[in-house]
C-alpha cells in the first residue's frame, strides 16, 4: 500500500533519512528529458537539402499566450499580488530559468550556452552593482558597435569598459522585458522548415548588418545559400594575435604573433598601466612597451599585405574579438585595416580563450553549426527539481540495512535524533498492518558543477618566516603578549617555533616569590632605577633578592638581565651587573643577555663592565666582543664629530653649486631671449667702452651683461673654443646651423 503524498518516509540506505522535497503522488511519472538538438554544419548545406526547404523566419512563438499562462513563480517574475519577487529570493524554481536575464530554457545544454554569453555575464555584473539590466535587443544593439571586450574573458580587460555599456533607454529596456518571448537568444535567429523542424543559426554568419527592421528575405536567402563563403577571423588579447582567412572549411592563410606585453600576476597590458598614470621605469616595463610597439607594427604590416588586404576587401563576414585597450591594432590611425562602421564586422558572440589558430577554427566551427529541433525550442519545458520515485524493497534487505546503520558513527546520526521518534512510530503502525512491502524514497540530485567555466582551488598559504623574525627584532618596543593556556587541546608542533622575547619574559614567574619577582621584573622593563636600587639594597639582608638575579625562571629561561637588555634599559643593565648578575647565563635557546639587547647603547654597558671587571666572568661565553674604554669612546665621539662636520660642509658646497647652476641657467635663458639687434647693440657698446678705456655702459639686466655667450642658446663660452661666422660666436656647429637657417642663410 503506497503512502500518501504528504507523508515522510524512512530510507533504507546507509541509515540516512530522506524526505520528499515536493509533494507528489507516488504513481506520478517523472518528467521526460527533452531531446538533445541535432547539429548540422552550415557550410555543408546546398540549395537542394531537404532541411532548408520551405524555410520561414520565426518571430514569435505560436503558443506565446500559453507560454505566459499562470505558472509556478520564478525569481524575478510578477506575483499574483502585483509585487515583484526579489531576484535574491530563496525559492527553488521548477524550471530552467535565469533570473538575471529573465530567460526560460528547454534543456541543460541551452542553459549552459546562455551562461557563457556576454549578455548574461554583463547582466550579472550590472545586478551586483545595483544598476539596471540590459534587455536582449539593447545588448545586441550595443554589442554591434564592438564594446564587449571587457566581458569576453580576455586576460587584458579593463573595468572601465563595463561602465560604457549602459542601456540606451533604461525605461524602455525595463518595459520590454515582460513582452520578450520565452527562449529568446541574442545573436541567434530561429527558422522553421517545411517539415516542421526548427533551426537555430547565429546571426553573424547570415550576412552583414541591416538597418532595423531586418529583412527576412535576405536572412533566408543567406541561409539557403550556405552562408558566406569567405570569412576573416581576427582575435587579439594580452600580447597574442591570431588571424585566419577561410574559404568554406578550407584555410587560405593564417598567422599568429606573440609578444611579452603583460606582466605576470598583474593581468593588464603595459600601455593600459601607463594610461592610468602609473608609468614604471623598470627594464621589464620598457621591454613591454617595446613589444607593444612591435606587435602593433607586425599586425599592421600583415593586414596591409596583398593577401590580407584583398581578403579583408572581399570577405563577406569579418569576425572580430579584441579587448578595449587592444583595439588600436585594427582601428584608428593611418591605414587602419578595419573601420568601425563596416556592416560586415561582427563581434564574436562566444566566450573565447587565448588567441591561437586552433581557437579560430573552433570559433568558426561553433558559429557555422545549426541546431535542429523537432519541436519549438521555446515551448519545451523541463522541471529543474530532484527526480523522486517510490521503489519497493523486500524484507530481506532490512537486516542488511540495520547492519549498515551500525557501521555509521554515532556523531553522524546526532542531528537526526530528534526526528527519528515520530518516524519510527509511523513505520511501526505500517508493520502492524501486515504489509510485506516497504517503500523507499530515492532522491536523484542534478549537479551543476559542469556549468563552471574554471576550477576554483583554495589558495595555498605561504610560510611567513620573515614576519616572525621582524616580530622578534621588535619585541623590545611592544608590550607583553598574552600567554596561551597550558591545557589547550591543540597538539604541540614537532618543529621548534620561534617565540617573541616579550612572551618569554612574561612567562618567567618565580614559584616561591611571585610578588617579589613581579616587582623586580616591572622595574627592569620600565627602567625604574630607584625602585631597583631599593630592592637590591634590601638584598643584603634578604637572600631571596640575590637568588633571583641569576635564576632562569619560566619556560623561556629568561633572567632579569635578559629582560632589561631586551627592553633597552642601559642603566638597569649596569645596576644589575654591579649587583652581581651573571652575563653568561643563557636562556632556553642558548642566548646570553648581550645577544638579546635592543640597541647599541645597551650592548655598550656590557663592554664597559667588561673593561672594569676583566676577569670576573667568561666573556667569550657571554659573547661580549671586547672591552670599551674611555679612550675608545673619545675616539668614536671625535670620529662622529668629524664625520658630521664633513657632511655639513659637503651639504653647503652642494647647495652653493646648485645655486650657481640655477643662476647660470637663468642668465642663459635671459640672454637667449634677447633679439639679435639687442645682442649686437650690447656687444658694440662693450667694444666701444673697451677701446675708450671707459667703464662699460649700463645694461638692462646684470643677468645678461656678459656677451661672452653662445649667440643661439646662451651657453657661456668660458673655457670653450667658440665657432664664429661674421660677428657671431657659437658653442657648437649645431647652434651655428640653427642660427643660419633662422637668418635665411642655409649652411653649405
Swiss-Prot record:
Family indicated by similarity: Belongs to the ANKZF1/VMS1 family.
Record field: compositional bias (Polar residues): 484-497
Any single Gene Ontology cellular-component annotation: cytoplasm
UniProt keyword list: ANK repeat, Coiled coil, Cytoplasm, Endonuclease, Hydrolase, Metal-binding, Nuclease, Phosphoprotein, Repeat, Zinc, Zinc-finger
Known role: Endonuclease that cleaves polypeptidyl-tRNAs downstream of the ribosome-associated quality control (RQC) pathway to release incompletely synthesized polypeptides for degradation. The RQC pathway disassembles aberrantly stalled translation complexes to recycle or degrade the constituent parts. ANKZF1 acts downstream disassembly of stalled ribosomes and specifically cleaves off the terminal 3'-CCA nucleotides universal to all tRNAs from polypeptidyl-tRNAs, releasing (1) ubiquitinated polypeptides from 60S ribosomal subunit for degradation and (2) cleaved tRNAs.
Domain notes: The VLRF1 domain mediates binding to the 60S ribosomal subunit.
ANK repeats: 515-545, 556-585
Protein name: tRNA endonuclease ANKZF1
Recorded coiled-coil stretches: 628-681
Compositionally biased spans, kind Acidic residues: 155-167, 429-438
Compositional bias segments (type: Low complexity): 143-154
